[in-house]
Swiss-Prot record:
It comes from Chloranthus spicatus. PsaA and PsaB bind P700, the primary electron donor of photosystem I (PSI), as well as the electron acceptors A0, A1 and FX. PSI is a plastocyanin-ferredoxin oxidoreductase, converting photonic excitation into a charge separation, which transfers an electron from the donor P700 chlorophyll pair to the spectroscopically characterized acceptors A0, A1, FX, FA and FB in turn. Oxidized P700 is reduced on the lumenal side of the thylakoid membrane by plastocyanin. The keyword Nucleotide-binding does not apply. This is Photosystem I P700 chlorophyll a apoprotein A2. [4Fe-4S] cluster binds at residues 559, 568. InterPro entries: PSI_PsaA/B, PSI_PsaA/B_CS, PSI_PsaA/B_sf, PSI_PsaB. It is an enzyme of class 1 (oxidoreductase). The gene is psaB.
């Protein structure tokens, strides 16, 4: 018999039912579970797949550049970034008919096009790209990198070029390489690009390979560097009347500490960003020389961790045994990496709007909203993944003997206390926040809005004041006009910071009140509950009170009810599954809050948010209902407008989302019976019965159906909100 899919598992390949296909797909990337896997092949497969991942990323970014150069309007956008709408790419077949063709022909294009809400135009413009030729060059370069990555991935699977296990487990060398080689050198290279290409570009000087060696980025060249007069590089910065991309009002400084925003572009000063990247480069280049490799100098990670034993015995044996535990578990390493990346992605969301780095992006409201929402959802998925792999670590890799009485073992020892504290925090936040919202709802319904319970967030306002926001009237730190910090700030450091904090047109330290206080606690409820589910799933992965022997059941077993001995103290997979719903819910609140607050800020009617956000009906009526009207009118009896694609996506998103419930709220036996009925009818129908299948059709397993339901729920949820977000924002601000 020919080898059947999946080749990596002979047991599955011989399964006579359709389970073979679904389980094969589900375990295709679980290299550890494959038949003849060795530790060495496991590491080599993962290493090679990283190159494949890089190749896909480079190909994708190359495609962005290529399509904008081919079908976009980058050159005309550069002439007038505030009034020309950036085009992402052409649309082949706008739906439906001539009205749609006319509706989607915009941005100065000859035919129907999609508008770009990704911010790439602003990014490319800021870093010095100006022409379609520049974009094509970038696309070709990235295509070349993509090919190189593919070749490298293939090469490292060849016997001669396969790295050994010892190479993969050489943590110090990897740390040095990543700190110095990746972060340090790339930050230094980026500083170089900003200083040599982007900053001259922002001052109307076009630097390319042909004049790269002739144009001095600073009038004094490298002189100040060698004579120690570094302050000369900060003198004569761009003036507040500087027109970006021209020499009008431009200075000569390349590394500054101005603070605040460029008045015309509303983005951070390029010279501040160059300075920032130079500092980062310096720190990481130093950090990458700290660990002991071939030369016998520097720190040993293992020695550092073994020495970390807190005094007084309060944390037992501290970090003893952690080095080998982490270094020998790829799930632990992946969990740490995902946790870090998730936090960073969320920080990117928060900083991209409050401290915009790209010229004119702050005035492109739809792009701001899209980027914030995108990065928060990505962060949510990555963070939940961190806990999933933490749970797999406890099941597959954790060795109690190796970790006796260290911080890891002690987490397991007092997990009941951790769970109960998180549970208490979640219950407290949930009941109190809902109680306040519902009370306020009732007061408005009874026509007595003055009886609402409105709490000023005085601690948060105090923190904002300490950073220089004066409108609350706190006389503290940077908002205290006669304090030494305030006066020093005027001249020595970041003179533009205080102006930026107190100018109400940007998103830096938005004024907050009772509505913010309430939604902040609603979000805190979501965060704590999601964390509770995820932490419980990981800490109970090996065993729990009701089911002490989970380890041999593996990561994902179904809840089978009490009939077969009872596995209803859920599997670690089940915890991940439940947590994703909470994660989506929480980020829903986060994005609703961000979007509504900003819509009212951009429209100049902040009182709408302040007055309506203190009760639930306000959110439903004045945010969701009010802002969905343009969207729902994408198609109407009079024809089609340019929001019709979002109206369609909004409907389609609801469809996908609702389909999820078919898999989530259902009995497996119902599907099994339905499938057998259909198979029976098929086999007895003329013509149809000529077509046979090799695998006996069976219903999805409980875990599989949950996964399919979860995938539909997530995708539909995000499609629906993305359509709402883009249509409601672009419908208002064009």
């Amino acid at each position: 018999m020919a080898l059947r899919f999946p080749r990596f598992s002979q047991g599955l390949a011989q399964d006579p039912t359709t389970r073979r296909i679904w389980f094969g797909i589900a375990t295709a990337h679980d290299f550890e579970s494959h038949d003849d896997i060795t530790e060495e092949r496991l590491y080599q497969n993962i290493f090679a797949s990283h190159f494949g991942q890089l190749a896909i990323i480079f190909l994708w970014t190359s495609g962005n550049l290529f399509h904008v150069a081919w079908q976009g309007n980058f050159q005309s956008w550069v002439q007038d970034p505030l009034h020309v709408r950036p085009i992402a790419h052409a649309i082949w077949d706008p739906h439906f008919g001539q009205p749609a063709v006319e509706a989607f022909t915009r941005g100065g294009a000859l035919g129907p096009v999609n508008i770009a809400y990704s911010g790439v135009y602003q990014w490319w413009y800021t870093i010095g790209l100006r022409t379609n030729e520049d974009l094509y060059t970038g696309a070709l370069f990235l295509l070349f990198l993509s090919a190189i990555s593919l070749i490298a991935g293939w090469l490292h699977l060849q016997p001669k070029w396969k790295p050994s296990v010892s190479w993969f487990k050489n943590a110090e060398s990897r740390l040095n390489h990543h700190l110095s080689g990746l972060f340090g050198v790339s930050s230094l290279a980026w500083t170089g690009h900003l200083v040599h290409v982007a900053i001259p570009g922002s001052r109307g000087e076009y630097v390319r390979w042909n004049n790269f060696l002739d144009v001095l980025p600073h009038p004094q060249g490298l002189g100040p560097l060698f004579t120690g007069q570094w302050n000369l590089y900060a003198q004569n910065p761009d003036s507040s009347s500087h027109l970006f991309g021209t020499s009008q009002g431009a200075g000569t400084a390349i590394l500054t500490l101005l603070g605040g925003f460029h008045p015309q572009t509303q983005s951070l000063w390029l010279t501040d960003m160059a300075h920032h990247h130079l500092a980062i480069a310096f720190i990481f280049l130093v950090a990458g020389h700290m660990y002991r490799t071939n030369f016998g100098i520097g720190h040993s990670m293992k020695d550092l961790l073994e020495a970390h034993i807190p005094p007084g015995g309060r944390l037992g044996r501290g970090h003893k045994g952690l080095y080998d535990t982490i270094n020998n578990s790829i799930h632990f390493q992946l969990g740490l990496a995902l946790a870090s990346l998730g936090v960073i992605t969320s920080l990117v969301a928060q900083h991209m709007y409050s401290l915009p780095a790209y010229a004119f992006i702050a005035q492109d409201f739809t792009t701001q909203a899209a980027l914030y929402t995108h990065h928060q959802y990505i962060a949510g998925f990555i963070m939940t993944g961190a806990f999933a792999h933490g749970a797999i670590f406890f099941i597959r890799d954790y060795n109690p003997e190796q970790n006796e009485d260290n911080v890891l073992a002690r987490m397991l020892d007092h997990k009941e206390a951790i769970k109960s504290h998180l549970s208490w925090a979640s219950l407290f936040l949930g009941f109190h926040t809902l109680g306040l919202y519902v009370h306020n709802d009732v007061m408005l319904a009874f026509g007595t809005p003055e009886k609402q319970i409105l709490i000023e967030p005085i601690f948060a306002q105090w923190i904002q004041s300490a950073h220089g926001k004066t409108s609350y009237g706190f006389d503290v730190l940077l908002s205290s006009t006669n304090g030494p910090a305030f006066n020093a700030g005027r001249s020595i450091w970041l003179p533009g910071w205080l102006n930026a904090v107190n100018e109400n047109s940007n998103s830096l330290f938005l004024t907050i009140g009772p509505g913010d206080f309430l939604v902040h606690h609603a979000i805190a409820l979501g965060l704590h509950t999601t964390t509770l589910i995820l932490v419980k799933g990981a800490l109970d992965a090996r065993g729990s009170k009701l089911m002490p022997d989970k380890k041999d059941f593996g990561y994902s077993f179904p809840c089978d009810g009490p009939g077969r001995g009872g596995t209803c103290d859920i599997s670690a997979w089940d915890a991940f599954y439940l947590a994703v719903f909470w994660m989506l819910n929480t980020i829903g609140w986060v994005t609703f809050y961000w979007h509504w607050k900003h819509i009212t800020l951009w429209q100049g009617n902040v009182s709408q948010f302040n007055e309506s956000s203190t009760y639930l009906m306000g959110w439903l009526r004045d945010y969701l209902w009010l802002n969905s009207s343009q969207l729902i009118n994408g198609y109407n009896p009079f024809g089609t407008n340019s929001l019709s694609v979002w109206a369609w996506m909004f409907l389609f998103g609801h469809l996908v989302w609702a389909t999820g419930f078919m898999f989530l709220i259902s009995w497996r036996g119902y599907w099994q019976e339905l499938i057998e009925t259909l198979a029976w009818a098929h086999e007895r129908t003329p013509l149809a019965n000529l077509i046979r299948w090799r695998d006996k059709p069976v219903a999805l397993s409980i875990v599989q159906a949950r996964l399919v339901g979860l995938a539909h729920f997530s995708v539909g949820y995000i499609f629906t909100y993305a359509a709402f977000l883009i249509a409601s924002t672009s419908g208002k601000f064009g």
